[in-house]
């Protein structure tokens, strides 16, 4: 065996190691050397330890770019891989919401591979989307590795357009403007898909939903901004109350215009004096602003997916809570009406209508426990309404088989648990081995939105403290561990 000369390694082996597998490479150990700075990313030069992640890259824009591009690659890789995973596990005979999918429902909502009634007839578009994302992730991954390991540490000298100084207020608002333009283009991509490229899935299309072109989007600002100015409480529902594709696509037209116009404004102008005074201008401050914005998006998405069955069709995501409840009342009404019950006059145990009743304002609504969800609007029940709530003549003569099937399916796939509850408390899920994608998406976005908000507060506090000249973090000069001997 060739003898390796390395100071002290033989002594260490003799005293501490007994296994050959442990001895074999002991002489090539690389102890932590605080005198060697790794590209300006060690604790001495940056003030941040390795676990602070991108904080070490605050002043090395090239490496920070690499970290962000690599992160984008990871996200896109997950998207592609998970889409292919869902395609591989897809069972045509089962609804999407019974298969635990969260990506194919989004693609189906965009009108790809789906037909009348929300039936998936072609999974090839989903395969293509997955593969395109995988290829994109490889490109992003290579870019991330290049900028992290090979590219210039800073961009300011080599590529001035992409370089920046966190305190350069004009450059920061220019970057903000570029982001806004890109977001506006993203909003218009949905508009283009809905108007020109195959259309989108509309759960309100006659007969139980279908893919259609949205040829006449709502552009009336009173309608679009009326959603924004609505109360978020009760039946008003803020923007979450959008209930037709014309308003939804029209909203994207307005958002696209506003984002692009705002982006151009921020690119061409410099911040006003009041803005320069009002905001903190540092990397950590921008991080806190971003986290706050993401928090709002996450919490809004959480409410949207839970309550809205237009942007998130129940054919793909499963019914909303009120929808499953009303579906149960409707299913038993259909059953008992066939058995001869007079659904208009039958009384329940409380003396109120068992199947149908009047609301305080006189509307005919479903009776029983589901009365609390009287204001539900869903595609399978709307054809049965008249000028004053449910139409008794339609209930007796016009119920279609597709409405019965859909209600029975939704009844047994409630997002929160059994609707055969006691005192309004959900007892157990009403189906076997089932968790609604609405529940998954709602709770995940709620948690993410909450913790992003906590991150916003944390980084905003640190940024404000730094701007005011306070000490960031805790003074650790007197911690006992600093006076202890090294482990080895």
Curated annotation (Swiss-Prot):
Binds multiple chlorophylls and provides some of the ligands for the Ca-4Mn-5O cluster of the oxygen-evolving complex. It may also provide a ligand for a Cl- that is required for oxygen evolution. PSII binds additional chlorophylls, carotenoids and specific lipids. The keyword Plastid applies. InterPro entries: PS_antenna-like (IPR000932), PS_II_antenna-like_sf (IPR036001), PSII_PsbC (IPR005869), PSII_PsbC_sf (IPR044900). GO terms for biological process: photosynthetic electron transport in photosystem II. It is a multi-pass membrane protein. It is found in: Plastid, Chloroplast thylakoid membrane. [CaMn4O5] cluster binds at residue 382. The chain crosses the membrane at residues 84-108, 149-170, 193-215, 270-290, 306-327, 462-486. The keyword Plastid applies. GO terms for molecular function: chlorophyll binding; electron transporter, transferring electrons within the cyclic electron transport pathway of photosynthesis activity; metal ion binding. One of the components of the core complex of photosystem II (PSII). It binds chlorophyll and helps catalyze the primary light-induced photochemical processes of PSII. PSII is a light-driven water:plastoquinone oxidoreductase, using light energy to abstract electrons from H(2)O, generating O(2) and a proton gradient subsequently used for ATP formation. PSII is composed of 1 copy each of membrane proteins PsbA, PsbB, PsbC, PsbD, PsbE, PsbF, PsbH, PsbI, PsbJ, PsbK, PsbL, PsbM, PsbT, PsbX, PsbY, PsbZ, Psb30/Ycf12, at least 3 peripheral proteins of the oxygen-evolving complex and a large number of cofactors. It forms dimeric complexes. Belongs to the PsbB/PsbC family. PsbC subfamily. This is Photosystem II CP43 reaction center protein. It comes from Pyropia yezoensis (Susabi-nori). The gene is psbC.
């Amino acid at each position: 065996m060739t003898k390796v000369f390395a100071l002290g390694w033989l002594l260490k082996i003799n005293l501490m190691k007994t296994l050959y597998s442990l001895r074999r490479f002991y002489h090539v150990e690389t102890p932590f050397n605080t005198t060697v700075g790794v590209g300006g990313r060690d604790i001495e030069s940056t003030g941040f330890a390795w676990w602070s992640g991108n904080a070490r890259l605050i002043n090395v824009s090239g490496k920070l770019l690499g970290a962000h591009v690599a992160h984008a690659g990871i996200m896109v890789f997950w998207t592609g891989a998970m889409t292919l995973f869902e395609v591989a596990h897809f069972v045509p005979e089962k609804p999407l919401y019974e298969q635990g999918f969260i990506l194919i429902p989004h693609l189906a909502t965009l009108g790809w591979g789906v037909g009348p009634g929300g039936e998936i007839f072609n999974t090839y578009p989903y395969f293509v989307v997955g593969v395109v994302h995988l290829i994109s992730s490889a490109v992003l991954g290579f870019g991330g590795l290049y900028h992290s390991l090979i590219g210039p540490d800073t961009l300011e000298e080599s590529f001035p357009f992409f370089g920046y100084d966190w305190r350069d207020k004009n450059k920061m608002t220019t970057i903000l403007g570029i982001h806004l333009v890109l977001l506006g283009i993203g909003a218009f991509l949905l508009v283009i898909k809905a108007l020109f490229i195959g259309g989108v899935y509309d759960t309100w299309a006659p007969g139980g939903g279908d893919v259609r072109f949205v040829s006449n989007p709502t552009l009336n600002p009173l309608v679009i901004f009326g959603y924004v100015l609505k109360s978020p409480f009760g039946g008003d529902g803020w923007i979450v109350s959008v209930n037709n594709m014309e308003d939804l696509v029209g909203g994207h037209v307005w958002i696209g215009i506003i984002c692009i116009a705002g982006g151009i404004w921020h690119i061409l102008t410099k911040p006003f004096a009041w803005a320069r005074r009002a905001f903190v201008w540092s990397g950590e401050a921008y991080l806190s602003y971003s986290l706050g914005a993401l928090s709002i998006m996450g919490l809004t998405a959480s409410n949207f997916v839970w309550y809205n069955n237009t942007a998130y069709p129940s054919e793909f995501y499963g019914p909303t809570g009120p929808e499953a409840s009303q579906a149960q009342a409707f299913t038993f009404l259909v059953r008992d009406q066939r058995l001869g019950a007079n659904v208009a006059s039958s009384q329940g145990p409380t003396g109120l209508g068992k199947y149908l009743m009047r609301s305080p304002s006189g509307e005919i609504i479903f009776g029983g426990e589901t009365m609390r969800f009287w204001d539900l609007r869903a595609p399978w029940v709307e054809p049965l309404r008249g000028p004053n709530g449910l139409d008794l003549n339609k209930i007796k003569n016009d119920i279609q088989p597709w409405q019965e099937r859909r209600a029975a399916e939704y009844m047994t796939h409630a997002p929160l648990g059994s609707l055969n509850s006691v005192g309004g408390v959900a007892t157990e899920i009403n189906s076997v081995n089932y968790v609604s994608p609405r529940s998954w998406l709602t709770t995940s976005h709620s948690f993410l939105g909450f913790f992003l908000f906590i991150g916003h507060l944390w980084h905003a506090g640190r940024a404000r403290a730094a701007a005011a000249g306070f000490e960031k973090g805790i003074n650790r000069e007197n911690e006992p561990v600093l006076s202890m001997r090294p482990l080895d």
